[in-house]
Amino acid sequence: MNDKTVNAGQNQEAGQNPKAEQDSGEVFFQEAALFLAETYGRMLDDRVQLKALIDAGVIPYTEEMAIRDLSAVSVGYNTERVQTSNISNIPERIAALLDSGYVEKMNRRLKQEMAETARDYAYLCWKIETVETAMRERMSKKEQDIFERIFLRKRTYRQICAAYKKGTLHNKQISQTKKKCLQAIADHLKNASCFPMYSRYMDNLRRECQQEK
């Protein structure tokens, strides 16, 4: 019995199936490619909005803001980690919350939210760059154009055919080009999965694809 036979037997005993794992990986790359293509336009819009939030920065939360906000609500004071339920006077409740560090807590919360926004923005940029790198490096100019018409401009096959010289493009060709474009993105994702620096993004993308099912 040679080493290959022994290794194969060990893999089977351990319940491992390299071929099945490979097939599962290929399915994920195909599903992820379609997900990225279909959400490409929305991702571009989201990037603009998140960039604006990040550029605006965190506005410091002041004591004046706290007094205004706390005065505007009639319930919920006792949700902070300070006992105020036994204080019936609203100004006294507000003073107790301020003394307990309410403003500082709010500033920490705002900074945490901005940090989360920055992480979301970085991940979003990576997804967009994945699509656009695949377009630049793995698609012809015509394929790029058809890809944008399908997924970005949401054109129908008939509209795409009409945009080209009559008789030069048919539905079957568009369908074939669409498959080639999606394969280009899948291939780029497969290549990116080899780099540990992208493992967290890959995990996030896998979860997003699962949620879409």
Over which residues does each language-model region extend?
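N-terminal interaction/assembly modules
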Residues: 1-134, 190-213
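Alpha-helical hairpin
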Residues: 138-139
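A short pre-motif secondary-structure segment
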Residues: 146-147
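Short, locally clustered residues in the helix-turn-helix/winged-helix DNA-binding domain
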Residues: 151-152, 186
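Helix-turn-helix DNA-binding module
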Residues: 153-173
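DNA major-groove recognition helices of helix-turn-helix
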Residues: 174-192
